[in-house]
Amino acid sequence: VTESAIEKPLFYRPRPARLHSRVVIAVLILGGILLGKWKLGLRKPRKASVEVSEQDGVRSLHLGSETVQSSMKLADPYELVLSYTRAMMAFLLFRPQPRHVVMIGLGGGSLTKFIYRYFPDTRTTTIESESGVVAVARQYFQVPADDERLSVEIGEGGAWVAAHPECCDVLMVDGYDGIEQVSEICSADFYANAHAALTDDGVLVVNLWNSDLRFDAYLQRIENVFAAVVCVPAEKRGNVAVMAFKRSPGQPRWDDLRSAARALHSRYGLEFLKFVEGMRSQNPRSASRLLA
């Protein structure tokens, strides 16, 4: 498939057909490989299809499997529909005014759009390995065009991070291929490069599946590099947002975190108080402090 052919969906149904109780809007072929209805249980090739579907007013992105990568509410395109994307915003409890956010993995652009809308003084750079995913995100998920605040770049996330030391104060990593986390962005070398890519007060935020047999290994790799690590379980079981701090946040008092959570909830509408309570269940703590 040529680059120009990837710019738009190669398969479109003006009269959508039902597939797994969803309406299929379009399927985009990446790398010349199109998977069928996810049959046979075979592990998909790295480059596969991008499917856009709709159900009950929610549009979703799939990468060659039934797993939902991104979702957008048509009535509110900037809302963070999936609970793991909301959990990844828990970093605001510690870094409420990010200056430059770098994201590895665009998907449907949920986090990119949220930062763009609610943080007008923040610069956002999003790295996506597939040009076709970028095209779909902009055509079907209302990801804005690049401007002085937003840049969406085509490239491999691990290589980009390695080439940009001390470039950002927040680095968000959500790179899955529909089956598992992309290996280039969960290695010990990647986490070391992520540490180097952050400013001194920076924080790495990684979306991990707690059902992944390698979850503990990934977490250990992060802990080996960063000064402090805090896990935030998503409201829907299965995902954990791992926040890793280049410089330790100390031992924040629970009362202070709850106060910050209430203020952030009022501003952004996310369940920050639940994030705080999730931290209590997942991390070293005392009755009065986190990481104590």
What are these regions (language model features)?
Residues 188-251:
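C-terminal substrate-binding/active-site "lid" region of AdoMet-derived donor-dependent transferases
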Residues 55, 78-196, 200:
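The AdoMet/dcAdoMet-binding core of the Class I SAM-like
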Residues 66-70, 176-179, 204:
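A short, flexible beta-alpha/helix-coil linker loop
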Residues 121-123, 147-149, 201, 226-228, ...:
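A generic structural signal for alpha->beta connector loops
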Residues 181, 208-212, 284-291:
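Alpha-helical subdomain
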Residues 9-14, 23-25, 29-56, 60, ...:
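SAM/dcSAM-binding transferase cores
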